[in-house]
């Protein structure tokens, strides 16, 4: 009898165990189905528009990974390249020079990027930067000028058009202080343009505290490299345009032999890599009225451009104490595109003759409507020319073309350049 009872008890135990196993398997399968349904439902709600049948396991896994990255690091931390902002549509600030804006390819200097303006002394670097500040202030922007050289001329800034009452000025004691306050301003998200004048004047604190004549090997280069790593991250989260003004030095040793660069910029190589645009500005001539020198002819070469084709050059006039002469730019470009007819010393505009360039400049200064009309014609002409160039390029790609290799000349990072200005388009070579 006891034997029979033991057999009955073991049979009941085995039946109970099998029932538990069946329930756990069924529960697990329902749980897995629920997870899959949630993943598909979530991917639908995110706007993918894919049906459950149309999404493979790989696509579901990718969507789950993207959702996890977005929830962990925020919106925009990962995206499809084709859905991002086009480089040609980035917001910009005008440089104050119509010819230079055209040469840059995007209409000005881009927000949220690093731009380097470098060149020899008295070439117009600070003047160009002040024009950018003036244009940004016209759009209601907040601007900061970090005067590391302690040499900003407020009267020149006013003459250019800068609202000095609303311009923030900092004259830091050392390079670390200057770059630290720049980073703080960028992170605030409330500043539109910051100009640092200049990289050569960003003296490291260790050099200031040392003795005269002490060797400080690559101290400034290390400072710039470390600072730019932080600043590039801060800029990626803001819409601040950061302009570094830089000087050039003679390069004494050239390991590349003859034909290598004879000039080099200050602060090491970090700025060259982090800058989205590098503008090399030079004085190429003087402007005289009789015996008096009233200004200089300036050439700006776009050595680096991440947003448009580089190696173009713009030429314009700088009037001493006034800045860029915009009317001269308009006249020169209008002659080039045949909106103004020139015959000797006479200029014909809308059927009226003007004897000499100065007479035409005076007329345009007094009649802003005619000046704006010429600007509108030039803009429409340049847009039409750009569209025609794109069609020509697409047609020429189908045909064999001759490639010409031109060696650069003996200046820092220079290459063949397209001139945008009064003169026709030319190619500069060694």
From Swiss-Prot:
ATP binds at residues 119-126. The keyword Transmembrane does not apply. GO terms for molecular function: ATP binding; ATP hydrolysis activity; ATP-dependent DNA damage sensor activity; single-stranded DNA binding. GO terms for cellular component: mitochondrion. Keywords: ATP-binding, DNA damage, DNA recombination, DNA-binding, Mitochondrion, Nucleotide-binding, Transit peptide. Signal peptide: none annotated. SMART domains: AAA. Its main location: mitochondrion. It holds the Pfam family RecA_C. It is found in: Mitochondrion. Residues 385-415 are annotated as: Disordered. GO terms for biological process: DNA recombination; DNA repair. The keyword Secreted does not apply. SUPFAM superfamilies: P-loop containing nucleoside triphosphate hydrolases, RecA protein, C-terminal domain. It comes from the Eukaryota. Involved in recombination ability and DNA strand transfer activity. Belongs to the RecA family. PANTHER family: DNA REPAIR PROTEIN RECA HOMOLOG 3, MITOCHONDRIAL-RELATED (PTHR45900:SF6), RECA (PTHR45900). This is DNA repair protein recA homolog 3, mitochondrial. It comes from Arabidopsis thaliana.
């Amino acid at each position: 009898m006891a034997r029979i009872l033991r057999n009955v008890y073991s049979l009941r135990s085995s039946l109970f165990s099998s029932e538990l196993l069946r329930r756990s398997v069924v529960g697990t399968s329902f749980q897995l189905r629920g997870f899959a349904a949630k993943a598909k439902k979530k991917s639908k709600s995110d706007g993918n528009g894919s049906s459950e049948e149309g999404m493979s396991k790989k696509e579901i896994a990718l969507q789950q990974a993207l959702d996890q990255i977005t929830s962990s690091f925020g919106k925009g931390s990962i995206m499809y390249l084709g859905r991002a902002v086009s480089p040609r549509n980035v917001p910009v600030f005008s440089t104050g020079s119509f010819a230079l804006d055209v040469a840059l390819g995007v209409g000005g200097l881009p927000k949220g990027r690093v731009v380097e303006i470098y060149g020899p002394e008295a070439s117009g670097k600070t003047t160009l930067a002040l024009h950018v500040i003036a244009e940004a202030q016209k759009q209601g922007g907040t601007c900061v000028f970090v005067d590391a050289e302690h040499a900003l001329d407020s009267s020149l800034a006013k003459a250019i058009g800068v609202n000095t009452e609303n311009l923030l000025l900092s004259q830091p004691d050392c390079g670390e202080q200057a770059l630290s306050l720049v980073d703080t301003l960028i992170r605030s998200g409330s500043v539109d343009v910051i100009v640092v004048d200049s990289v050569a004047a960003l003296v490291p604190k260790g050099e200031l505290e040392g003795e005269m004549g002490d060797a400080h090997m690559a101290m400034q280069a290390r400072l710039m490299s470390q600072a730019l790593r932080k600043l590039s991250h801060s800029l990626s989260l803001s819409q601040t345009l950061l302009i570094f003004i830089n000087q050039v030095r003679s390069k004494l040793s050239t390991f590349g032999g003859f034909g290598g660069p004879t000039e080099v910029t200050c602060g090491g190589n970090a700025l060259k890599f982090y800058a989205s645009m590098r503008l090399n500005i030079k004085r190429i001539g003087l402007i005289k009225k009789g015996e008096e020198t009233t200004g200089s002819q300036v050439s700006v070469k776009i050595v680096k451009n991440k947003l448009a084709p580089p190696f173009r050059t713009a030429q314009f006039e700088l009037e001493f104490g006034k800045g860029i002469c915009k009317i001269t730019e308009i006249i020169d470009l209008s002659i080039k595109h045949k909106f103004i007819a020139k015959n000797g010393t006479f200029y014909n505009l809308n059927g009226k003759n003007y004897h000499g360039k100065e007479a035409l400049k005076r007329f345009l200064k007094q009649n802003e409507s005619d000046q704006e009309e010429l600007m509108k014609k030039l803009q429409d002409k340049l847009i039409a020319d750009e569209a025609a160039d794109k069609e020509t390029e697409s047609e020429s790609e189908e045909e064999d073309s001759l490639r010409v290799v031109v060696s650069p000349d003996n200046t820092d990072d220079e290459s063949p350049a397209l001139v945008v200005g009064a003169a026709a388009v030319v190619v500069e070579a060694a």
